[in-house]
């Protein structure tokens, strides 16, 4: 019986997945029982829900059933507090005081974070009971760096849980000394100057208030090699170094999330947190939290804006504060011609991913590929690029000065080399859910066909579908006049981008022209030497009116709506505007004037232009350690720098290695639980240092596998795990034979950028209709039987569409697994795959690097895009959104057979990115809550567009919208999710970002600035300055500092912080090598100075570069004086 509400179809789907999981689990268990592996059973426990995950990751045993009861009764956060209370009361076994407190905090935090992220394990180092100076006892929580993975809210709630545990243990409050209070302020300043910045920059008084009032001590381990200089050697602070985890919990937890903590405190009636209200009020007064406060947006006119009024919204410049070399700026903040805000969701957008017209992806020189991350101005901090061809395309000016709307990919490819200027970048499609998630005020909607259609529907005005999507110029004008409705959006120009005086000038200039019957276009004489012609031609470009320039004449094809918009009755050859100068004078603004002139209502085309710059390029690549290795079998320095075990054997080399081992009764050293030479079960102990019998193990493994010449096999130098237990060498050999690589935990992974998709076409995923029917896809979104590969199907929530390169890699991995089953475990092959299509239907694990829980998925197909397509629920189950991050896929049977906790590094964060537990069935209620805000409608109502003009908060109009949250707990939570905008192909557009294909940094920056030069919404000089200031200068200074502080290394692998007195390696006597070279220090110097001169950056930046150049020269140039004779001065 499933624990989730689902239709009969979805229930069968989940049962199929469970059956496959259990089958693979059985196969792996049978293999593990043979005793060849580190542990004799599969080490990944299966979890059906959050409660199972919590018990599997942090415990205590038998807590899962109680968690289910409490969550059902109280809700997640109250349940977390109650379970913490019951743990310290001894309901789940007797613990010591400190042990019980630590278990309570970890378990409660695991409940809050859905049992997915690694923070409860790795983010809390330990919990101690310490003493105040008055002798009373208090609770101290030691946070570590991985607490970041929990997110700010969970970090704050961890502190709240600590306080709740403290009260139930009858402990006193933490009473800090003045020095301890000031220590936090010093650390926070030092962290931001030496390590990285926080999302929120607190005032010193806020820090003092928080530290003095929080009832538990927020402390932690040293995370960075930076020491405080003022408040050192404090009795209750064990380190003088920065405690990064503690600072994160304090700043990005308690201080940043104060409003959320208050809601929980009030709801749960927890005492001692009223001081947060005063803190919250102060923050609101100074508008610190730009994300949550509506006051950040200033309006020029009255608040209740109409669609005709000007709307001045404060630009957000944070996204452009740092510009990376080689990654273009596509639009400066709110700059005219930037991305036009369009509301809606396509089948491949939502959950922080926005849609862009595929044409613009080509026009910006392929810097926007499918999956490329953009840092955006609003509503969130970042997004992922995906194509949506049903939104407004870019408008460009060609080298011959013609202006053209590039509405197809074919046109974009044809004209891309002829583009002189990109006048308008086109739409950015953002769904309502992203505004709701970011608590960003709704911004006025652009005038679009879906809004226009709603007006016609509400007024019962008949129309055709063809008219809505593609009206002729005459149809649009006549329809507007006869029905007294606004002009169709297709012919509504950007009149607001020029002044009313410009409109007056443009009108007079256009009416000097005449109709050319031969070309069926409006013709205007154009003299390149005439300033009036030049300025009015520019006005024509700025309103987005397409035209051709041929032999000194301008030809306008869409003249009909243009003339009527300007008040000229073309049919009667009559200028209907009287007292033109008076109208211009009396008009409040440009939109007022154009409506006074026209024969119909003209809506404002665009209110908001959104700025954006490139973030990370898309990614689809196999996961490899550095350097890449085939197995977790250590050989020390025997394999030299290339770490090839076969070369070590050929050269007769070995090395001393610290490793678990035992002397078997057969007289051989066994590194495994079962002696590979006699087959006897043994118990390795250690770790101890031994001379590794590499040759014996190599030939034994080859004989066992019946392989003669496996080729090169790369191994590790040593294990970083606690017990130094190793993986069988046979696995490394088989991986090498099949050209696959291993990760730290024994699995073989493929990383790719997360992109959402809720619906797909069979032709997009390279799978036949018949195969899809076998996988349970029987009907399309309209209820019709699946017959052809162009029908749109709704993606099942645990199905994934992987990159083609991932399928190629997994094909190799499947062959490795089959070889492993057959040649090592002596079992039947499982996959038997000969091509990519054979892997469709097989199970994988999806996992994010900041988590410790995997999610079962099923391969349903593959695309050419270098991204991992999956349902938004699937990404949310990994605690991810889709703003450009990357996660991993790996075959489920590979994980069951090869994963072991014994391989994980014995260091802080070592258990992150490891499948310590596996969720088998996706429950939408237990995934990251951000996806609950995603809208699931097939269309937005008219009231939505009208309310957007009032700039209401998203919550004020939530009753108008349907989101995923409204479906939770019902059968509809899995099926019937809608989208508003169609797209032809989800992978249409460039597949590889230019950033990845360009070679040198000079090439990258040249291409970056070439893009900036041709975009109207971008200032190339400002881009050049920002690249130098935010990227090159810090790198140059940092590299100079690194050179002066560097250590040295030897080819044998030895490293020294300082050069030994002998001047050579103490281990082998070889010459020592610098770890930072001269080239690394000055690599950006020439490109920086070239850019500075070419783009005439400020004198300040030029002088900074000169000073850095001087520093580099003084470091590397020999200034030693030469002895000269006096006669040398007279030559």
Curated annotation (Swiss-Prot):
<protein>
    <recommendedName>
        <fullName>DNA polymerase II large subunit</fullName>
        <ecNumber>2.7.7.7</ecNumber>
        <ecNumber>3.1.11.1</ecNumber>
    </recommendedName>
</protein>
<dbReference type="Pfam" id="PF24846">
    <property type="entry name" value="PolC_DP2_cat"/>
</dbReference>
<dbReference type="Pfam" id="PF24844">
    <property type="entry name" value="PolC_DP2_central"/>
</dbReference>
<keyword id="KW-0548">Nucleotidyltransferase</keyword>
<keyword id="KW-0235">DNA replication</keyword>
<dbReference type="InterPro" id="IPR056171">
    <property type="entry name" value="PolC_DP2_central_dom"/>
</dbReference>
<keyword id="KW-0238">DNA-binding</keyword>
<dbReference type="GO" id="GO:0003887">
    <property type="term" value="F:DNA-directed DNA polymerase activity"/>
</dbReference>
<dbReference type="GO" id="GO:0003677">
    <property type="term" value="F:DNA binding"/>
</dbReference>
<dbReference type="GO" id="GO:0006308">
    <property type="term" value="P:DNA catabolic process"/>
</dbReference>
<keyword id="KW-0808">Transferase</keyword>
<dbReference type="GO" id="GO:0006261">
    <property type="term" value="P:DNA-templated DNA replication"/>
</dbReference>
<dbReference type="InterPro" id="IPR004475">
    <property type="entry name" value="PolC_DP2"/>
</dbReference>
<keyword id="KW-0239">DNA-directed DNA polymerase</keyword>
<dbReference type="InterPro" id="IPR016033">
    <property type="entry name" value="PolC_DP2_N"/>
</dbReference>
<comment type="subunit">
    <text>Heterodimer of a large subunit and a small subunit.</text>
</comment>
<keyword id="KW-0378">Hydrolase</keyword>
<keyword id="KW-0511">Multifunctional enzyme</keyword>
<dbReference type="GO" id="GO:0008310">
    <property type="term" value="F:single-stranded DNA 3'-5' DNA exonuclease activity"/>
</dbReference>
<keyword id="KW-0269">Exonuclease</keyword>
<comment type="similarity">
    <text>Belongs to the archaeal DNA polymerase II family.</text>
</comment>
<keyword id="KW-0540">Nuclease</keyword>
<dbReference type="InterPro" id="IPR056172">
    <property type="entry name" value="PolC_DP2_cat_dom"/>
</dbReference>
<dbReference type="Pfam" id="PF03833">
    <property type="entry name" value="PolC_DP2_N"/>
</dbReference>
<comment type="function">
    <text>Possesses two activities: a DNA synthesis (polymerase) and an exonucleolytic activity that degrades single-stranded DNA in the 3'- to 5'-direction. Has a template-primer preference which is characteristic of a replicative DNA polymerase.</text>
</comment>
């Amino acid at each position: 019986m499933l624990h989730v509400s689902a239709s009969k179809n979805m229930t069968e789907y989940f049962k199929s997945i469970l059956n496959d999981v259990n089958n693979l689990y059985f196969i792996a268990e049978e293999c593990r029982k043979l005793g060849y592996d580190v542990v004799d059973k599969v080490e990944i426990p299966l979890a059906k829900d959050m409660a199972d995950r919590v018990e599997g990751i942090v415990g205590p045993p038998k807590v899962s059933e109680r968690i289910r009861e409490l969550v059902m009764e109280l809700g997640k956060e109250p349940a977390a507090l109650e379970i913490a209370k019951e743990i310290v009361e001894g309901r789940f076994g007797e613990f010591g005081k400190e042990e019980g407190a630590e278990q309570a905090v970890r378990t409660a935090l695991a409940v809050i974070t859905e049992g997915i992220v690694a923070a409860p394990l790795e983010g809390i180092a330990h919990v101690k009971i310490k003493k105040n100076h008055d002798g009373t006892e208090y609770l101290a929580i030691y946070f570590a760096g991985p607490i970041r993975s929990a997110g700010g809210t969970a970090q704050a709630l961890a502190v709240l849980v600590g306080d709740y545990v403290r009260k139930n243990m009858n402990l006193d409050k933490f009473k800090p000394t003045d020095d301890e209070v000031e220590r936090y302020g010093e650390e926070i300043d030092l962290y931001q100057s030496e390590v990285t910045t926080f999302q929120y920059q607190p005032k010193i008084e806020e820090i003092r208030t928080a530290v003095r009032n929080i009832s538990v001590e927020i402390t932690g381990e040293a995370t960075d090699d930076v020491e405080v200089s003022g408040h050192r050697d404090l009795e209750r602070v064990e380190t003088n170094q920065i405690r990064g985890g503690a600072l994160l919990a304090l700043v990005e937890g308690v201080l940043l999330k104060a409003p959320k903590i208050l809601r929980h405190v009030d709801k749960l009636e927890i005492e001692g947190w009223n001081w947060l209200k005063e803190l919250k009020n102060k923050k609101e007064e100074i508008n610190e939290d730009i994300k949550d406060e509506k006051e950040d947006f200033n309006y020029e006119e009255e608040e209740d804006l109409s669609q005709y009024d000007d709307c001045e919204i404060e630009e957000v410049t944070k996204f452009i504060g740092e510009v990376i070399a080689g990654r273009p700026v596509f639009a400066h903040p709110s700059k005219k011609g930037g991305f036009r805000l369009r509301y809606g969701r396509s089948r491949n957008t939502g959950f922080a991913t926005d849609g862009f017209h595929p044409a613009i992806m080509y026009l910006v020189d392929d810097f926007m590929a499918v999956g490329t991350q953009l840092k955006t101005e609003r509503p969130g901090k970042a997004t992922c690029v995906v194509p949506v061809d049903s939104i407004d395309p870019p408008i460009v000016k060609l080298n011959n000065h013609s202006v053209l709307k590039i509405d197809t990919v074919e046109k974009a490819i044809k004209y891309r080399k002829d583009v002189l200027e990109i006048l308008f970048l086109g739409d950015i499609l953002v769904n309502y859910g992203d505004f709701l998630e970011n608590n960003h005020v709704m911004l006025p909607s652009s005038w679009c066909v879906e809004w226009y259609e709603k007006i016609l529907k509400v007024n019962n005005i008949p129309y055709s579908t063809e008219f809505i999507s593609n009206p002729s110029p005459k149809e649009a004008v006549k329809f507007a006049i006869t029905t007294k409705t606004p002009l169709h959006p297709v012919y509504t120009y950007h009149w607001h981008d020029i002044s009313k005086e410009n409109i007056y000038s443009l009108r007079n200039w256009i009416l000097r022209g005449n109709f050319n019957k031969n070309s069926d276009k409006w013709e205007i004489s154009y003299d390149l030497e005439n300033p009036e012609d030049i300025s009015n031609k520019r006005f024509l470009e700025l309103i987005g009116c397409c035209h051709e320039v041929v032999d000194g004449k301008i030809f306008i094809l869409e003249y009909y709506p243009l003339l009527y918009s300007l008040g000229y009755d073309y049919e009667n050859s009559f200028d209907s505007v009287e007292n033109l100068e008076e109208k211009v004078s009396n008009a409040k603004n440009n939109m007022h004037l154009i409506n006074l002139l026209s024969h119909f209502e003209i809506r404002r085309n665009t209110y908001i232009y959104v700025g954006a710059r490139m973030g990370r390029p898309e990614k689809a690549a196999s996961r490899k350690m550095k350097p890449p290795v085939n197995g977790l079998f250590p050989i020390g320095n025997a394999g030299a720098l290339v770490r090839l075990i076969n070369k070590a054997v050929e050269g007769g080399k070995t090395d001393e290695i610290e490793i678990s081992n035992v002397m078997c009764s057969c007289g051989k050293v066994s590194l495994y639980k079962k002696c590979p030479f006699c087959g006897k079960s043994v118990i390795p102990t250690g770790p101890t240092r031994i001379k590794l019998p590499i040759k014996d193990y190599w030939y034994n493994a080859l004989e066992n596998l019946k392989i003669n010449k496996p080729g090169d096999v790369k191994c590790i130098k040593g294990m970083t795990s606690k017990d130094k237990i190793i993986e069988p060498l046979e696995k490394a050999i088989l991986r090498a034979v099949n050209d696959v690589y291993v990760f730290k935990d024994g699995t073989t992974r493929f990383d790719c950028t997360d992109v959402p998709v809720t619906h797909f076409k069979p032709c997009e995923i390279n799978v036949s209709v018949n195969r899809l029917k076998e996988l349970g896809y029987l009907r399309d979104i309209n209820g019709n039987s699946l017959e052809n590969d162009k029908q749109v199907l709704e993606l099942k929530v645990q199905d994934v569409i992987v990159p083609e390169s991932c399928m190629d890699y997994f094909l190799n991995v499947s062959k490795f697994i089959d070889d492993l089953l057959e040649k090592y475990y002596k079992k039947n092959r499982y996959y038997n795959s000969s091509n990519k299509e054979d892997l469709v239907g097989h199970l994988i694990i999806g996992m994010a690097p900041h988590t410790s829980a995997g999610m079962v998925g099923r391969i349903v197909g593959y695309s050419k895009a270098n991204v991992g397509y999956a349902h938004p629920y699937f990404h949310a189950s990994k605690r991810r959104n889709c703003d450009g991050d990357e996660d991993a896929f790996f075959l489920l049977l590979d994980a069951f057979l090869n994963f072991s906790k014994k391989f994980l590094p014995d260091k802080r964060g070592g258990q992150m990115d490891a499948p310590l537990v596996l969720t088998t069935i996706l429950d939408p209620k237990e995934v990251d809550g951000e996806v609950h805000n995603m809208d699931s409608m097939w269309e937005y109502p008219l009231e939505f567009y009208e309310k957007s003009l009032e700039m209401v908060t998203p919550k004020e109009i939530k009753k108008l919208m349907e989101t995923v949250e409204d479906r939770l707990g019902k059968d509809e939570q899995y099926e019937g999710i809608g989208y508003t905008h169609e797209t032809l192909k989800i992978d249409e557009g460039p597949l590889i970002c230019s950033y990845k294909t360009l070679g040198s940094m000079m090439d990258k920056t040249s291409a970056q600035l070439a893009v900036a030069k041709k975009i109207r919404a971008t200032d190339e000089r400002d881009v050049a300055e920002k690249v130098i200031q935010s990227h090159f200068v810090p790198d140059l200074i940092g590299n100079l500092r690194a050179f002066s502080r560097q250590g040295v290394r030897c080819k044998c692998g030895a490293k020294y912080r300082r050069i030994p007195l002998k001047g050579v390696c103490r281990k082998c006597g070889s010459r020592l090598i610098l770890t930072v070279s001269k080239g690394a220090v000055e690599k950006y110097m020439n490109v920086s100075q070239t850019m500075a001169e070419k783009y005439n950056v400020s004198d300040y930046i030029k002088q900074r570069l000169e000073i850095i150049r001087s520093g580099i020269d003084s470091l590397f140039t020999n200034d030693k004086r030469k002895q000269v004779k006096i006669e040398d001065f007279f030559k």
